[in-house]
């Protein structure tokens, strides 16, 4: 795909990375100071266990890394505008091993980023929980948080609530609309560049390799 897109200048692809158009995470991106970040936690809690037992259980190649964790990986890469240096992946299928879905249903990724930033990402597909993208961004003097209790900023030992419309589903259409407008009108800038998608896939492949080989990549 990479070489085909480089050869055919009139070919374009996009991806369903809708967290980029979520107004809360766009706010987080504006609020961070990259040099001050030292740790990020992102948890994709799927909350729709029943979906595992449809086509996902029948597809040998299906991976919770590419089907769930990828969204948090992209979110952190997009917010920081950084690509990880290394990744170690741990996984199990304890909740689902006696079901139709025998693949790993929980993955945990530990990533090293430039600027001495560490990140922990999990994708939990079998939890008895609502669907949510939890995020914590730890900086020297503040923490940005989104969880089941809402969205907050901790600063100077005080807690400030962030008024947000998370999960902000109405904004998801902006991504595909941007792609269509780009193809039709040619006067729009793509929200997701080709190179960003290839960088994201390379991280996911490295995470998958680490999981299978049980070592850092």
Tell where the protein language model's regions lie, with residue ranges.
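Contiguous beta-strand/loop segments that form the cofactor/metal-binding neighborhood of enzyme cores
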Residues: 67, 73-151, 176-189, 206
């Amino acid at each position: 795909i990479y070489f085909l897109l480089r050869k055919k200048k009139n070919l374009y692809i996009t991806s369903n990375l809708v967290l980029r158009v979520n107004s809360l995470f766009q706010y987080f991106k504006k609020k961070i100071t990259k040099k001050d970040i030292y740790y990020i936690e992102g948890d994709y809690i799927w909350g729709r266990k029943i979906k595992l037992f449809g086509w996902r259980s029948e597809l040998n190649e299906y991976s919770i890394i590419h089907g769930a964790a990828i969204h948090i990986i992209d979110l952190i890469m997009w917010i920081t505008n950084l690509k990880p240096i290394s990744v170690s992946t741990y996984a199990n299928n304890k909740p689902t091993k006696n079901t139709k879905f025998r693949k790993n249903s929980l993955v945990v990724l530990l990533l090293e980023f430039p600027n001495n930033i560490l990140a922990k990402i999990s994708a939990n597909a079998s939890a008895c929980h609502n669907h949510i993208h939890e995020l914590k961004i730890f900086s020297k003097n503040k923490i940005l948080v989104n969880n089941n209790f809402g969205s907050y900023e901790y600063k100077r030992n005080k807690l400030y609530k962030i008024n947000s419309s998370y999960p902000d589903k109405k904004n998801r259409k902006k991504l595909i609309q941007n792609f269509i407008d780009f193809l039709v009108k040619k006067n729009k800038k793509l929200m997701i560049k080709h190179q960003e998608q290839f960088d994201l896939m390379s991280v996911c492949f490295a995470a998958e390799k680490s999981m299978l080989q049980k070592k850092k990549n």
